[in-house]
Design a protein with these regions (language model features):
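Repeated loop/turn-to-beta-strand initiation elements of outer-membrane beta-barrel proteins
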Residues: 28, 68-72, 104-107, 159-162, ...
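Membrane-embedded beta-strand positions of outer-membrane beta-barrel proteins
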Residues: 32-34, 74, 109, 152, ...
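Transmembrane beta-strands of outer-membrane beta-barrel pores
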Residues: 36-42, 78-82, 102-104, 113-115, ...
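Outer membrane beta-barrel
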Residues: 63-180, 208-212, 433
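Signature for the C-terminal beta-barrel architecture of outer-membrane proteins
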Residues: 143-311, 315-317, 324, 443
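Detector for outer-membrane/organellar transmembrane beta-barrel domains
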Residues: 223, 267-283, 290-400
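Outer-membrane beta-barrel "beta-signal"
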Residues: 382, 443-457
């Protein structure tokens, strides 16, 4: 998915897990930020300009140290305002974990964010960290959600390290369609997520090679995909008027296996990066509307850095294994117009036939969401990032084009740093696509211009 991938690592990676500030052997260091932001979009129904999001936010970031072998990190966010035409007042513990490091062996326990993958905009290997692509924040890293996990690591010499992660608590990502208005008769029932039994946990293994000439990694993941599928429950129709009464669906988690690899190779001022992954569901996807097909996904990019300009150009592709064409149009609705042509063609509409028709539509919608309606997908992307006037003015222009679906994503922004710690940022996040594409569905709701002011301390 393009938008969710647009917060990948590389150019935009700024997680607290990787970069909390410390000062010598201080027992506790404090930092954080205060941010105000406003997003202007169009209402989904009448397409009138409105405040899509307007909020004030405080982030408090702490790092504590106990001797030379124990550290603890916390990132706490407070946010108040309005979003998607609803008031918000929330407290979020984004990260809170403890690290123990003794010699080559380390342990981490708690809630943290550490995505897999080295790509800038697409990370096929990142199945372990969930995301919220509807997040209204000028910092793309805020789309990453924390997981509660136990991680152990062992250094095998100067360049190799093995990490094993066990995540017993399922943390779903947020679907792009969450802010999209649905017909009144479409009901999302309580989600079907795994419990806290030990055999419901997920685990991942990562082998890192960090050498002067090469940065590479191998990955294995066995657990629940962070994106739940949309499962069909039931459909009720008035048989006299053929009008829908209720379409009941629910989010349902499913388990996958994933194997992947990536590498990054610096050559002078150039960096060559590639990443690829294979995954399949542990259950057969045949006739199960919420399960995706097995797939191979892969990306390759070239980065060139200069004195004031960085250019990243890349390719992202997918191959859908065991592909078969969808049997219906992708839809999360069941209107009268969908059944009348069948009746006029002589088909006898029974409850069983209606269930099959609606289930096939939901299956196609899941494939639309997962980009599996076609056997192959090809996308290209370009990121331009310029720094001017001694790094007081920054311009960033990420662009993505999907050749298969003819969809666009553009997220230009300009940042001004008039004083130390102060950033004023303005930009636009836009998604466009033709009829029956995901961007055509979510773009009119998510597209927005924004301005934010952030003071970091």
């Amino acid at each position: 998915m393009c938008l969710s991938a647009a917060s990948g690592q590389g150019l935009f990676e700024t997680t607290l897990s990787e970069g909390a500030n410390t000062k010598g052997d201080d027992a506790l260091t404090l930092g954080g930020f205060i941010r105000s932001a406003v997003y202007l979009g169009n209402t989904p129904d009448e397409e009138k300009p409105y405040l899509q999001s307007a909020y004030g936010q405080v982030g408090l970031q702490m790092k504590a140290r106990a001797g030379t072998w124990a550290t603890a990190v916390a990132d706490i966010r407070f946010r108040y305002g309005t979003e998607w035409q609803q008031n918000i007042s929330e407290l979020n513990i984004r990260e809170a974990y403890v690290d123990l490091q003794t010699g080559p062996v380390g342990f981490r326990l708690g809630k943290y964010i550490s995505p897999w993958g080295k790509g800038t905009l697409f990370n096929p290997t990142n199945k372990i960290i969930p995301m919220d692509p509807t997040t209204r924040s000028p910092d793309p890293d805020d789309m990453n959600l924390g997981i509660w996990a136990l991680q152990g690591s062992v250094r095998l010499g100067s360049y190799l390290q093995v990490r094993a992660t066990w995540n017993p608590l399922y943390q779903p990502g947020k679907l792009l369609i969450d802010p999209i208005p649905m017909p009144d008769y479409v009901n999302f029932l309580d989600p079907d997520y795994p419990g806290v039994e030990l055999d419901d946990g997920s685990y991942g293994i990562q082998l890192d090679l960090r050498a002067p000439a090469l940065d590479a990694a191998l990955y294995w993941f066995d657990g629940y995909h962070s994106w739940p599928g949309i499962a069909y429950d039931s459909f009720i129709m008035d048989t006299l008027t053929m009008e829908p009464v209720a379409l009941n669906v629910l989010e349902k988690a499913y388990r996958i296996r994933m194997a992947g690899l990536d590498f990054s190779l610096p050559v002078g001022s150039w960096i060559f990066t590639a990443e690829g992954a294979w995954f399949e569901t542990t259950e057969s996807h045949d006739s199960v509307e919420y399960l995706p097909f097995p797939e191979l996904s892969y990306s390759a990019e070239i980065e060139k850095s200069g004195a004031w300009l960085t250019v990243i150009a890349g390719y992202y592709g997918k191959y859908i294994i065991d592909f078969t064409p969808a049997l219906a149009e992708p839809n999360l609705s069941a209107e009268q117009e969908q059944f009348l042509p069948l009746m006029q063609g002589g088909m006898h509409i029974t409850s069983e036939a209606v269930d099959v028709i609606v289930q096939e539509q939901i299956s196609a919608f899941n494939r639309l969401y997962n980009y599996q309606l076609e056997e192959y997908y090809h996308s290209t992307y370009l990121v331009l990032k310029g720094n001017f006037f001694h790094n007081t003015l920054e311009l960033s222009v990420p662009l993505i084009y999907n050749f298969t679906t003819e969809e666009w994503i553009a997220q230009p922004s300009v940042s001004w740093m008039p004083a130390d710690g102060l950033k004023v940022q303005a930009g636009y996040s836009g998604l466009w696509g033709g009829a029956n594409t995901l961007n055509d569905l979510v773009g009119p709701v998510l597209n927005a211009a924004y301005i934010s002011m952030t003071l970091t301390f």
